[in-house]
Amino acid sequence: MSSHRATFFCDPPKPETHTIPNSVSLKNLLAVVLSIQIALWVLMGLNVLGISIPIVQPLIGFLYLTFVPGILVLAVLRMRNLGIVETILYAVGLSLTVVLSIGLVLTIIFDALNILTPFSLITITSSVSFLVLLLCAFTYFSNRTHPKPLFNTKISVPLTPTLFLCIIPFLAVFSTYLVNTYNVGAGQLFLWSIIGVVVLLIAFDKVIPSTLYPLAVFVIAITILFQQTLISTWLYGADIQSEWNLANAVLTAGIWNPNSSVVQYNGMLSVVVLAPIYSLISNLDLIWVFKIIYPVLFALVPVGLYQIFRKQLNVKVAFLSCFFFMSFATFYTGMITLARQEIAELFFVLLILLLVSKEMDQRIQSALFMVFGLLLVVSHYGLFFIAVLFLFLMWLVLTIARVGGSKLTLRHLQTKIGIHTDKQITAPSHWSLPRSLGVHKDKQITEPSPSPPPRSLVTILTISVLFIAATAWYFFTAQGSVSIRIVSLVSNIAGSIGDLFNPRYSEAVYVVAAGPVSGLLHRVNAFVNYLNVFFMLAGVCLIVFLKNQRFKLQVPYIVLSSITLGFLIASVALPYLGAELNWTRVFQITLIVLAPFLVIGFVKICEAAGVVTGKVTSKLGFGNSTLVSPSRLMRLLAIYLVFFLLLSNGFLFALTEGYQNMALSTQVDDVYNHETIAGAKWQASNSVTVPLSGKRVTISYFADGVRYEDTSQITDANGQIIYNQTFSSAGRREYYAAFASDGFYQNSTSAIVDVNVGTNQVSSNATGQSTANVSSAAPTITLSASTTIPEVGQPVTFTIKLTGDQVVYGDYYNTILLSSLGIGQARLPFFLQNEIANGSNIFLGTYNIEHNTILSVNFEGVNALADYQNVTSLTSNRSLIYSNAGASVYS
């Protein structure tokens, strides 16, 4: 770090600093917690009286749920010396654990007691408050005899750069206001420039000291996330619409039913429990919980990564690694559409942080590892299976290196990674990379060599418990749809194993084969992305395979990185694997581990190029080059990464090509304006039930415990099947009708109709209506009989009627919106006029009307291909039944 501090214009005197107290006493902690608790009660009481104070309750509620339970748990565990950053990270992780556990336990207890509304304001508030007060008592009794402070958090903070950083997220609020209100994106462009300036100030050792690097990481993360999430008053993206719908159903019904939907997200507590509780406690609409609170929680992921990298490399490398992670577009565009994965990645990062932490008590470390692992299970099934695969392979490699007969493997680790039995590590004189990464050349390091994680942290028992818990959870929630999907994925991969690197089944290969969009800047963008991958590959290879070089990366992390790189390659090569999560999301997940290797690869390659250049210039008589000093390389890398960010977020495209995206304009098709939302809500409230014709229904019955299929017929124009049956023998028969999914409507089964032949016993059910499937996309099927007590030989007329939600057609983005509002039959595509079902409606949003086009999506293998088509032919022979100058509905 340079000893000179500077502003943008001159070298100022030493900046004023503020020192945060180095201790938090038991008395002070309990006083703050109880004050927040009482303030929350008062605010809720005022709300009951009809007095609402804007901003205050959402802020107090957020702080209460996000920090208070976790801080108290840390105090009970006497985890005093974590430092302020790790204290915040673990406190948030433990607070989320407490909140999710409360929601799950209440659901189980209320279901057992047959009480209907565990997710009500009074129930949630009482439960959380009771647990907080209980934790306060535990904190008091476990620490009252210990004179030491609860937390040691001493840190010197320069006031001017701190205030400068803290202002930046508020600029995001202002810049998005300009876009939403005036459709002006200049504020967004300016803010991206400010972020670039912050990165360069850090790289050039100006203004911002290293103590503020974690704050800078958080500020950059939350700013670029808010630049996206605060656009529009509605949510952006596909998955998050379904997540909102499920969470809203919990709030509306006051209860979470684990099997109320076949949608896999219904088993994710990170959506169906966490969001409703935040909404209730903070008095914040569910939309804004997803748009504000979830991004704030997700912004802690890069902060956690900074701690992981800082424990192994120097602070500058840790910061630039985090900035690269945040600069990848999926971080701020794709992840904001996946609320469950935002929470899951936080738990995943906490697991890795535990792996590289050496200061923590081993028993507490193991307990936290298990807790965060279980929370990952109920947060995101895809990321959990990736994580447990990584952990299992890491355990396997490290176990082989430990046990007898593994001398060859151990020798490989010693020679390839640089671990020596004498615990003396020497960097060769020609190797200058470690200086820039926190290791000095020509210096013997006498500290013990890194060792694998404690046996109690990553063991086969821990991994087995997590896997069994996940299997049980995914089997018993969301009607087992997660388990079905995983089995289907494995089957698809196994059945197509001969199609390695086939672009039809690999999104990454398809993108590379298709090449970039025409235009110089698009080609530069593609080249930079390929270059990033090259630097990461080079970095991993340098660590693992190059002899006699030693980095401060721990052995478990190196093994984890190698496994992660292998998974990334497999997601490209294996059919269906990358597409299951979407390949850009897979790449974003792997960056959690691989981000620092871009820095390592960049620096080493530049140093090698510098050596060659130096030799050439020396022979030409120009002397030795000093252009590749460590500090200059860090600055060069910072400039490169800022350029990468400005390419990824559309800044350079906006300046040179007038390009618009959702962060810069509301006049793009993936942004829902007020008129489009109003029109969609009108359609949702005016949808009708229509008969389903041309659908096959099977009528079956049980007699003496044996199932018989009676008939299978097609519904007529009225959605009915009418048929007669004559019985030749007496006895009881239980009839029901069933409809099998046809790709548009889900399975549905009617209730039982008892038919007692040759007896005067009256059936209690002459008409059965479907109740088996409560999904909005499931049709209703009714079965009735003309009589349920016929005589032998007397004909009985059975009537089956199949009805379903009215079909509403919309383009790709509007279909997502309509589905989130509960329209179970919002469909794509508009390819041919004769595909439009009778009795259906067509919904057009603002973008469709202004451009007279609709966006449809085709699939070529696993690759989604977007196509804009003219809408005139679809609406020319239909009646306009709704219009608000920004949305239209045709019948």
Predicted regions and their residues:
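Hydrophobic, aromatic-rich transmembrane alpha-helices
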Residues: V197-I202, L466-F467, N525-K552
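Active-site lumenal/periplasmic loops and adjacent helix-entry segments of GT-C-fold
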Residues: P54-I55, G61, T181-G185, L201-L346, ...
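Transmembrane catalytic cores of multi-pass membrane glycosyltransferases
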Residues: I51-S52, S127, G237-I240, F331, ...
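Membrane-embedded, hydrophobic transmembrane alpha-helices
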Residues: S2-S210, Q414
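Transmembrane alpha-helical segments
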Residues: L383, G601, L633-D670
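Signature aromatic-anchored transmembrane alpha helix within multi-pass, membrane-resident enzymes
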Residues: E447, I463-I468, C606-L652
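Membrane-embedded helix bundles of polyisoprenyl
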Residues: V92-T107, V132, C136, Y140, ...
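Membrane-interface helix-loop-helix junctions at transmembrane boundaries of multi-pass membrane enzymes
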Residues: N152-V157, D205-I208, Q362-R363, S406-Q414, ...
